[in-house]
UniProtKB/Swiss-Prot annotation:
Biased composition (Low complexity): 436-449
Coiled-coil stretches: 373-431
The protein's name in its UniProt record: BUD13 homolog
Keywords: Coiled coil, mRNA processing, mRNA splicing, Nucleus, Spliceosome
Composition skew (Basic residues), residue ranges: 274-287
Xref: PANTHER family: BUD13 HOMOLOG
Organism, as annotated: Gallus gallus (Chicken)
Protein family: Belongs to the CWC26 family.
Length: 559
């Protein structure tokens, strides 16, 4: 299983580094419609007179000038545009048309999207012959001669060489700083044309590296020779069709342009990395200078893209997707131009950090095909997290639950239970007292006395005899109707009650009735101070009773 996993990883690496021969052709065909439309427009520009289409390029040029970050991206192309301006001061409209229609350096200066469109044109083999015509028309015309007069032949030839062959433009972009002294010469020769865009590019800090790069005379003569030899060079355009050279060129071109941009824009973070990139392709560049000419010859003879793809896979497997992305850029000029630097910086470190957009699963493990080292690292991290959380689990098991009220204060449940118990006891006592009062205190006492008497009688033998004292006393105390001794008995009880000091009772005329038969106090003066409710109550009861009696008598009248 491990061997199969390694084979899959190798297969994925091959697939990502270099797509198969059929896929890049299809991608080129997809990208051709956007680039082909522009190529068709350029062909129409060649056919139509320069004066008729002059107005449209002026607007585009103004838009390019207004888009400052896009202008800052391609420094080499801007100085070339300055050369075109110097050469054709009399007619600025024709210069703008030449910048866009032809693959001249002015088009490179205008927008990075235009540079990418060139790459697309080089990628499309059908558009190569018209490009030759375009290169022949502006390159052979006075522009080159005037550039020779203005001592700026090297950048011009480099650009001309960059238009048919993408490998030389890489050198040109790596050699982009040698164009800085010609800029100074141009500013010295024609200071009027420099201010619009070149104020940013005229930053003196960037000039010394350009001098150093411009001081290297080795790159300029080979370019002239190569440009002189392959003027009619459809195979070179086919080289641009080759995916390995085109992505390399595209990647080197945005890198150098970004270096210049960042130098002029004073971006210290990304500039050193871009310079290192420019140096690294620069080291590759001598190999290109030595090896590119025989390779070009072989490609001219063979005209077959597959070996180029192989070289692309061998040399720059990571740069190929960047080149494709740059080819897709021309649709959005300013936006893609401004977004290109971060994209390139990401592609610089694909192996160290991996793709930043890789997804992770819910468990935190990286998704997709992962190496054994990455899995081992992830497992170790998970184990560390589990160990760090173990002591928390132990503490949480034995800790008491903390309850809080709405205000956030801790609740003492034990104290709350005690308080609630006390409240319940007090409530039960109060309820019992009210229940006792409701039943009646006298009735309660009588009931208690009866219970005591019953218990006492239970202790006596079953049969009662006449000489039983308790029975004899109970019978003597009873009052009987018609008993001559009854009055004597009452008086005797009254005397005994006085001795007991009982409360005095009311002894006046009969008081008014009430629902509960409550007797008035002994101090009542006989005045009724009620609201008359009791009288009305008894009147209603008497009326009701009378009606019932009358109805009963009426019902039994015939009987």
């Amino acid at each position: 299983m491990a061997a199969q996993g390694v084979s899959k990883a190798q297969y994925l690496q091959r697939y990502l580094s270099g797509p198969p021969a059929a896929q890049p052709r299809r991608r080129r065909k997809k990208k051709l419609p956007s680039g082909s439309g522009r190529a068709g427009m350029r062909i129409v520009d060649d056919d139509v007179g320069w004066s008729s289409i002059a107005a449209v390029p002026e607007k585009e040029e103004e838009e390019d000038e207004g888009d400052m970050p896009v202008v800052a991206e391609f420094i080499d192309e801007r100085p070339d545009e300055v050369k075109l301006m110097e050469e054709f001061r009399t007619n600025s409209k024709w210069k703008l048309l030449g910048d866009r229609d032809e693959d001249s350096p002015s088009s490179d200066v205008s927008v990075p999207a235009k540079a990418t469109t060139r790459q697309q044109r080089h990628d499309s083999p059908d558009n190569s012959p018209p490009r030759r015509v375009r290169h022949d028309s502006p390159d052979l015309s006075p522009p080159r001669q005037e550039r020779n007069n203005s001592a700026s032949l090297l950048p011009r030839k480099e650009r001309q060489h960059g238009s048919p062959d993408l490998s030389p433009p890489r050198r040109k972009r790596h050699d982009s700083p040698d164009l800085s002294p010609p800029r100074r010469k141009r500013h010295d020769d024609s200071p009027d044309l420099s201010p619009p865009r070149r104020k940013r590019h005229d930053s003196p800090d960037l000039s010394p590296p350009r001098r150093k790069r411009h001081d290297s005379p080795d790159l300029s003569p080979p370019r002239r020779q190569r440009h002189d030899s392959p003027d009619p060079s459809p195979p070179r355009k086919k080289r641009h069709d080759s995916p390995d050279l085109s992505p390399q060129e595209q990647q080197t071109t945005p890198d150098l342009s970004l270096q210049r941009k960042k130098r002029y824009d004073s971006d210290p973070d990304s500039s050193p990395s871009l310079r290192k990139r420019a140096r690294s392709p620069g080291h590759k560049k001598p190999s290109r200078t030595k090896d590119a000419s025989p390779v070009k010859k072989l490609r001219r003879d063979s005209d077959s893209p597959p070996p180029r793809r192989g070289t692309q896979n061998a040399s720059e497997a990571d740069l190929s997707p960047q080149g494709k992305n740059h080819r897709a850029l021309p649709s959005g000029k300013g936006q893609h131009g401004s977004k290109s630097p971060p994209d390139l910086s990401r592609h610089h470190y694909p192996d160290d950090k991996g793709s930043p957009k890789k997804g992770n699963m819910m468990s935190g493990v990286r998704a997709g095909l992962v190496s054994a080292d990455v899995l081992r690292r992830e497992q170790q991290e998970l184990r560390k997290q589990e160990r760090s959380s173990k002591h928390l689990e132990e503490e949480s098991r034995h800790t008491e639950t903390i309850f809080r009220d709405k205000s956030g204060r801790k609740r003492d449940l034990v104290q709350e239970r005690l308080e609630q118990q006390q409240k319940d006891e007090a409530k039960s006592e109060r309820d019992e007292q009210y229940a006792r009062w409701g039943r009646g205190l006298a009735q309660g006492r009588q009931q208690q006395q009866n219970v005591e008497d019953a218990i006492k009688e239970m202790q006596k033998p079953l049969a009662r005899y006449i000489d039983d004292e308790d029975l004899d006393r109970m019978l003597r105390e009873q009052e009987r109707e018609g008993d001559p001794m009854a009055e004597f008995i009452r008086k005797r009880k009254a005397k005994e009650s006085k001795e007991k000091k009982e409360k005095p009772r009311y002894s006046g005329p009969a008081p008014p009735l009430n629902r509960f038969n409550i007797w008035p106090g002994h101090r009542w003066d006989g005045v009724d101070r009620s609201n008359g409710f009791e009288q009305q109550f008894f009147a209603r009861m008497a009326n009701k009773k009378a009606v019932q009696e009358l109805a009963y008598k009426w019902s039994i009248e015939d009987m």
